[in-house]
Structures are given as C-alpha cells and as structure tokens.
A protein has these predicted regions:
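Glycine-rich beta-strand-centered segment in the early N-terminal region that forms part
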Residues: 21-37, 47-92, 106-110, 128-131
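NAD(P)H dinucleotide-binding glycine-rich loop of Rossmann-like/cofactor-binding domains
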Residues: 88-165, 200
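Glycine-rich phosphate-binding loop and adjacent beta-alpha segment
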Residues: 100-102, 181, 192, 199, ...
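Adenosine-nucleotide cofactor-binding segment
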Residues: 161-167, 179-239
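N-terminal Rossmann-fold NAD(P) dinucleotide-binding loop
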Residues: 171-172
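C-terminal capping/lid region of NAD(P)-dependent oxidoreductase domains
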Residues: 225, 300-304, 315-334
Length: 334
C-alpha cells in the first residue's frame, strides 16, 4: 500500500510516497481505510524540523476514514464505521496526565498519511454522517483544542467576550464554538479579506493588527475598558504582551500555539496586575472529543475547510500552510 513518509531526512521536499506491507490487525486493533487528512502547524514543524522525532516517520496527526478490518476482541467499532483517529492514543477520559499524552500520532507514532492505517480500537471515535470525511479530519487536533479551551478549561457563554488571534484552524473553530455558546467574538488578522470572512462566520468585531498594531488596547475599547474574558493565544512571544493588555482582570489566556517562536518572554508584572490565568492547551481526551462532536451535530455546525488537495500533492499543501495563505483548515483526500 502507499504511504507518505520522511524516510532519510526531514524537509517538505523529502516527504515522499513509498510502499509498505498491508496492515493486519491484532487483538484489540483495527485497520482504517483513510479517506481524508488535515494539516496542523505541528505537522509543518515535524516535517520541516523533525521536532524531536526520529526517522523514518509517517507524519500528520489528523485523519478520518472507514473501518476496513477488526482484530479479535474489538467491540467499539465494526467494519464500515466512519471514524476519526485521535491525536493522543492513550488519553480516553479524565484529567490530563503525562501517561495520557505519551502516544501522539504523527510523531513519535506514525501518523495518518497512509492508505490503510492500523490503530488500537480505543484510539478512534465515530463521526456523524452529517460531516464529510474532510470535515471530520479537521477535528482531532484543531477542533478539540478549541473546544477544550473555551468549553472546558475557560468556558464561555452568553455575555462573555473572547478574542481569537488570526484565522487558522484553531482560531476559526474557537470563533464558531464561541458563537454557538452565545459569546461575543473579537477576531484579529493582518488581512481585511480574511476579517470579512470572519465577520461572515459571526465575529462581532474585527481588528487588522497590521494597520492597528495596538490591538490589545483596541480590544479594551471594544469592551468599554473592561477587557475580554478569554484570549485564544496562538502567537506566543509576538502577541502575549498584547493579549495581557486585552484580557480583563481575572480573565484567562489559553495558550494553544507558538506561531511567533519559542522564547521565554513572559510578562510577569502584567500577569500579576491582571490576576489573569494562563492555561496551556494541547488537544484533549476522547471523552471531550465525543462531547464536542455531539454538540456540533446538535448545532449543525460544519468546520471551515478552505482548500482540499489530493494526497499526492501534500508538498503543495504544506507550502500553502507555510505561507499562511489559508483560512480555517487545509485538507488532503486519499
């Protein structure tokens, strides 16, 4: 069968199609015929830099498909079921602990860029028929990270205001979930065209951070000086000081990305002054995933898929993400 892997070296140009034997499920295992995958910033880092992973590696964390074979003792799913892979293959429920985070797909475990993928049966969840395979493939990392951020760790509801940075996958999911939960949303971007698309999705206010670099102060103005209840922080060092300006006293900054780089500049006085909570978020449990999918089905909420590439154009898809030219999610089809 076909697999897309970094065999001897990392780098987009070194992610190539190879052949591997057909997988055979053992006890408690299943094989999934992969139908779609989606890109995350983590995948770009893994392919280009390795991100601490060893070669050879099949990258990409998020995919969806149909169960094509089951091993002995499997009862959670059956052949033909539509399923999503789960990023953490060992976090099923309960609070996050080190062991729960020890087996992520797409590094160090082989990821979803394979025609047929063997996994533990506990490492997938069923997906509703109302979602296409491409839509479902966006959920395991980006969707679940946004859900855990504003529905679990820093829950929002009617009367609350959140600020989402940019228009990538997690931020757009956070916008959609926040509106469904009844909250107000301020969205930022450097692109007026993307901000108009964010408004079409329900954003109450938008700020172009390129033309208005003091967007933290602007968020204060938009909330009559109070500040926002939650900031969905994706930029890291480049944006954290502005997030601390924007957040209200006693509010929360949920840190889910490091697009601005990996430095240690944390603005301690501002954090103290705001009595703000800073929460690191990386994906979630299977139980949280299932809760998210149930709410999405009830709300008839569909993920925003911006571009779809055939899997043999995966290098082009990664280059699009690298250029920041997307709104929402980029997907691959098998």
């Amino acid at each position: 069968m076909k697999v897309w892997a970094n065999q001897d070296a990392f780098g987009i140009e070194n992610l190539k199609e190879i052949e591997r034997p057909e997988p055979i499920p053992g006890a408690g295992e299943i094989v999934v015929e992969m139908k779609a995958a989606s890109l995350n910033y983590r995948d770009l880092l893994t392919v280009t830099m390795g991100a601490g992973n060893k070669l050879p590696l099949v990258p990409f964390s998020d995919g969806a498909g149909a169960v094509s074979a089951v091993g002995p003792g499997v009862s959670r799913v059956k052949v033909g079921d539509r399923v999503c892979s789960l990023f953490f293959q060992s976090w099923f429920d309960g609070p996050v602990i080190a062991e729960a985070r020890s087996k992520p797909l797409g590094g160090p475990l082989d990821g979803v860029l394979q025609q047929r993928m063997k996994m533990i049966a506990d490492g997938v969840s069923k997906i509703p028929d109302v979602l296409s395979f491409e839509e479902a493939a966006t959920l395991p990392c980006a969707g679940l990270t946004a859900w855990r951020a504003i529905a679990v760790e820093a829950p929002v509801g009617p009367g609350d205001t959140i600020l989402v940075q940019g228009t990538g996958g997690v931020s757009i999911f956070a916008l959609q979930f926040a509106k469904a939960l009844g909250a107000n949303v301020i969205a930022t971007s450097s692109s007026d065209e993307k901000l108009q698309r964010a408004k079409a999705l329900g954003a109450d206010h938008v700020i172009n951070y390129k033309t208005n670099p003091e967007w933290g102060k602007e968020a204060l103005k938009l909330t009559a000086g109070r500040g926002v209840d939650v900031v969905v922080e994706v930029g890291g060092d480049n944006t954290l000081s502005k997030s601390l300006e924007a957040v209200r006293v006693g509010g929360s900054i949920v840190v889910i990305g490091v697009l601005g780089g990996f430095t240690n500049n944390i603005f301690i006085p501002a954090l103290f002054g705001k009595n703000a909570k800073m929460i690191g978020i990386s994906v979630g449990s299977r139980e949280q995933f299932d809760d998210m999918v149930k709410h999405m089905a009830d709300w008839k909420l569909h993920p925003v898929v911006d571009r779809v590439f055939p899997v043999d154009q995966v290098q082009d898809a990664l280059k699009l993400m690298q250029a920041g030219g997307h709104f929402g999610k980029i997907c691959l089809t098998f």
